[in-house]
Amino acid sequence: MKTHIGTFLSIGSPAVTELAAECGFDWVLIDLEHGCESEAALPNQLRALRGSQTLAIVRVSAPHPDLVSRVLDWGADGIMVPHVNTVAEAQHCVDAAYYPPKGHRGVSRTVRAYGYGMRLPAGEMPKPIILAQIETADAVASADQIAAVEGIDALFIGPADLSYDLKARNSPLPYDDCVNAIAKAARDHSKGCGILVRHADDKEKLKALGFTWLAMDSDLSLVREGFKRNLEVARSWC
């Protein structure tokens, strides 16, 4: 299974989105859950990726059918859904993203995804990519069943939320054991597994566990660290 190297985009800038594609990322996560801009900024970010080989995955705030439909109609290659805790919630993601008979997404052939009617699919409608975020102890317990849902392409760990949830519940489960369990569930069902990578030193461990969707930090974090580093250099001159 191919390893996809990506990054999270929270700033909402088409220029930054375009730059990420120019740099060669396999995918970008355009964030509507924690991002700085509203849904209205999304179409121009997707336009910035046109002509590139970079996949556009949009994190929706929740799998509301109208929101998921608009995101995919605008041309996103797939969605990431936060806080998928149960099989029913995973199936709800598939229902919102897929056309009948697999789901209940409404059909319009004049949307941007199909060139406003100029690039209609010749055969079967394209399949959206669906990344289900595993971010709680409950989700870890259901990871095997979630991975078994047809239409879910990968389990994606939210490290911050998962760590917080385990601490808030005083869970006896060690974080690393949860990561291992999620990765195993994905492997057992031939699904991808992903995570937001905070430390480059984790590379070998994640590779050994079979992670295939890796997000290398975010645009805001990279800008922040660049600002801090340059300011530190400038102040050393004074």
Language model regions located:
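Glycine-enriched alpha-helix->loop->beta-strand junction motifs that scaffold or abut catalytic
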Residues: 23-27, 73-78, 97-99, 149-154, ...
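Glycine-rich phosphate-binding active-site loops on the catalytic face of alpha/beta enzymes
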Residues: 78-92, 155-166, 211-230
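Conserved anion-binding
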Residues: 66, 76-150, 159-163
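Conserved N-terminal beta1-alpha1 strand-loop-helix module at the mouth
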Residues: 1-64, 95, 130, 148-152
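C-terminal alpha-helical cap/extension of soluble enzyme domains
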Residues: 64, 105-116, 134-141, 173-238
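Conserved, mostly hydrophobic/aromatic
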Residues: 7, 20, 31, 71, ...
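Alpha-helix-loop-beta-strand connector modules within alpha/beta enzyme cores
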Residues: 39-73, 95-102, 123-125, 172-194, ...
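Conserved beta-strand positions in the central sheet of alpha/beta enzyme cores
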Residues: 28-29, 57, 80, 156, ...
